[in-house]
């Protein structure tokens, strides 16, 4: 049974999800998702949003349940902090400063930059280093620059299995790269957005902080539910677990597999000992 986070039409309204852009700024491709116009502002049909949001969350749940990685993308000012906070909360990855061309399609080069970032971190953290204060300041400057660009993906370990995007117009390069690599894209689409290339569209306000916060939180909650379900299915008690990062999840699953293997080996040894004792007892009875 899939336990997706619950939400109501009231939640959408209170978050301002239904407010689009000025009617003059619309993208005609969004017509199927628009309810009408009020005070020259397009109003999004929330009945469509409810259905499509549930579809998107279910798809996301299934991807994460299979231990897929999700990349949150939102580099506009009002989305940046929320994107980072919610991605970290559910143990996933994010880009919230600037999308560098080739982040997906040229992953090998990005991996080298990630390696360089980790090297700078080790140099700075090493208390026994022999570098001068000036050299350390230079390292920190380079580290900070890399961290702003790729800090949110430095532990991703490979291409993501899905993208969650706020503002498809601003993040169109990321979407094109994902499309090229057949990585599914889940995105909030405002009335000025182009739905082309979006596998799971969610019609909604992608500008207001409350709306962005609502979408990011419910996506994060869905990912957490999928992770908990996966761990519970493997017999792991999820009560008290606060770190749901992919690394921690893999550690828990490996430890659980070792425990099962040890228990199985111990059970086999016990059975062998019991059989040995039975044979000895049986043999002594036959002799008498």
Curated annotation (Swiss-Prot):
HAMAP family recorded: Ribosomal_uS2_B
GO molecular function, one term: structural constituent of ribosome
NCBIfam families, alphabetized: rpsB_bact (TIGR01011)
Database matches in InterPro entries: Ribosomal_uS2, Ribosomal_uS2_bac/mit/plastid, Ribosomal_uS2_CS, Ribosomal_uS2_flav_dom_sf
Keywords on record: Ribonucleoprotein, Ribosomal protein
Record-stated family: Belongs to the universal ribosomal protein uS2 family.
Annotated source species: Ehrlichia chaffeensis (strain ATCC CRL-10679 / Arkansas)
Pfam families cross-referenced by the UniProt entry: Ribosomal_S2
Protein name: Small ribosomal subunit protein uS2
Disordered: region residues: 255-288
Gene Ontology CC entries for this record: cytosolic small ribosomal subunit
UniProt-listed PANTHER family: 30S RIBOSOMAL PROTEIN S2 PROKARYOTIC AND ORGANELLAR, SMALL RIBOSOMAL SUBUNIT PROTEIN US2M
Membrane-traversing stretches: none
GO BP annotation list: translation
